[in-house]
Amino acid sequence: MAKKPSAPNNTKPATIHDQKATRGNGGELHQIAEGDTPVLTTAQGGPVADDQNSLRAGERGPTLIEDFHFREKIFHFDHERIPERVVHARGYGVHGFFETYESLAAYTRADLFQRPGERTPAFVRFSTVAGSKGSFDLARDVRGFAVKIYTKEGNWDLVGNNIPVFFIQDAIKFPDVIHSVKPEPDREFPQAQSAHDNFWDFISLTPESMHMIMWVMSDRAIPRSFRFMEGFGVHTFRFVNAKDESTFVKFHWKPKLGLQSVVWNEAVKINGADPDFHRRDMWQAIQSGNFPEWDLHVQLFDQDFADKFDFDILDPTKIIPEEVLPTKPVGRLVLDRMPENFFAETEQVAFMTQNVPPGIDFSDDPLLQGRNFSYLDTQLKRLGSPNFTHLPINAPKCPFQHFQQDGHMAMRNPVGRVNYQPNSWGEGPRESPMKGFRHFPSEEQGPKLRIRAESFADHYSQARQFFISQTPPEQRHIADALTFELSKVETPVIRERMVAHLLNIDETLGKKVGHALGLETMPKPADAAVATRQDLDPSPALSIIQRGPKRFEGRKLGILATDGADGALLDALIAAVEKEKAAFELIAPKVGGFTASDGKRIAAHQMLDGGPSVLYDAVVLLPSAEAVTDLIDVATARDFVADAFAHCKYIGYAGAAVPLLERAGIAELLDEGTIELTDAASAAAFLTEIGKLRVWGREPSVKLK
């Protein structure tokens, strides 16, 4: 009988710094299950002896096909990915709850709006629209703001954006607008950018997009944080009460920490320094217990009120200004828990506009009607089965029963004889006319036509209203964004066509962009189906700066410190930051930290090369007189100061930092936003002052686009 071969000896002890393991014949490490450590198994439950080597014929021979552990592991890896969303592919999800402020029984029979103080579980996914799953966070783009509320009457999905209007009026154009903004099909670039010919060619031939373009070219499209942006339901919906009386409703999420965005040059640099900037910001806020909140506001109106407008309330490219119809707070959304597994929850969550509880109904908005089909249809391809509602993140949290059965990956399988109704066996579930969803019996009439209502035809008036509602800095940013985007368009006639549209919105804006693009002669204003109204008043609610915060709460201060930094001043700054409910990070030449003047050794959060000032809402310079002589020769230190100044941020500095201000080229430009810090009182005053966030009066002098 042949001698039984012995297994290779993989039990030589090895230590890698703090980790104990064993070393195999080839020098590879093996971590062995001991004590209470779980044993690694296959997906079938079989324990695994060696997860570092495949089965071979001899130590240098071919891999054997009988190695079922290898085959299972590679098989699963090869099929890990699912198709990414065709839009909103890059997203970030957070758990929380919705709390009702007061009963809305007069308007809706939806259960979650009946009892003040009642909390309902919620899941929110924030996203960009155009970029792929691996794109950067701070693209100039619309942000998705999709909320799934697990009510006692089923899931309610309010699938919104951070902009209250959209590019198109009819869902049949949705493939076209998305195709145009995605990478061009013959070259597969640019990624997560609208600055290319296809997008602007489509927009320039789609006048209904002009209002949306004003929003996307504004600072709304480059938010500082998910926590500092509004959300909108976009469409007009209906509330329906127990008497089957209908009230039109528009939904608004308003952040309690106020609105805030970045500037374009800052966004570009943030994307290079931290492509996950928005994700990291949300993660850090939740982990530190600073749970972001939004108030849910509604605009409520009836048909008589709607009939007073020159535009159509079914048009998703229009808003009802808050000054015309004030919003009413009806509840709050609090986000307080991160997902336990990104794929299982954030990636597999399925939002559908059709998911509404009894008491909330649809309008005839043609974009909403199309979304109701598309958002259901897309889940089959992406999640692979009609049973995507079996996934825990998508399943209702209320009791549910139905006769839908079988299909791929069915995880909820009913038992018993009955799988249909009506049936004779006395078994449910049964329909309930009283509790069930009842569509509002609106009267409809007219022939079948492929035609758009004339009430949808005014494409420029609200675009103009948005522009004139902005402060001068915000208007500059819109003009600069249009100039930048159109400068990337290679086809001159497309640029000229867009300028012709801009002249209809605001003549000064159109000429400014045209001159910046180098047009020798201005085109004629584009033909308009309806002339631009000049009598619409500015709406301050449309401005970020006018709706910005009053405090530094929720923001982050970057403190650049070196060996010998003033320890007392640093302690005072940290105390002031914490009192303001803000955050801070210490940046030092080395991540190992620095020794303050009082002898304390303090660890840094970031090394200077990895912590540029673009990552912070305001900065403080705390070098020592000795260390600053070396710091002034470091390019990243000079950039830290110059960028903060150019981006109109507040800069606090100790007296020893003056040489750094000089080398950064701003010593002769100091203004009310550059503040010397000397003691605890000045530190506290600085934290109060920086609640304004930006010194916009500085912007014309820095001439930074």
From Swiss-Prot:
Residues 1-31 are annotated as: Disordered. Keywords: Heme, Hydrogen peroxide, Iron, Metal-binding, Oxidoreductase, Peroxidase, Plasmid. Its cofactor is heme. Its EC number is 1.11.1.6. It comes from the Bacteria. SUPFAM superfamilies: Class I glutamine amidotransferase-like, Heme-dependent catalase-like. Pfam families: Catalase, Catalase-rel, Catalase_C. It catalyses: 2 H2O2 = O2 + 2 H2O. CDD domains: catalase_clade_2, GATase1_catalase. GO terms for cellular component: cytosol. Decomposes hydrogen peroxide into water and oxygen; serves to protect cells from the toxic effects of hydrogen peroxide. Could protect cells in nodules which have a high potential to produce hydrogen peroxide because of the strong reducing conditions required for nitrogen fixation and the action of several proteins. Either KatA or KatC is absolutely required for the protection of the nitrogen fixation process. PANTHER family: CATALASE, CATALASE-B. This is Catalase C. It comes from Rhizobium meliloti (strain 1021) (Ensifer meliloti). The lineage of its organism: Bacteria, Pseudomonadati, Pseudomonadota, Alphaproteobacteria, Hyphomicrobiales. The gene is katE.
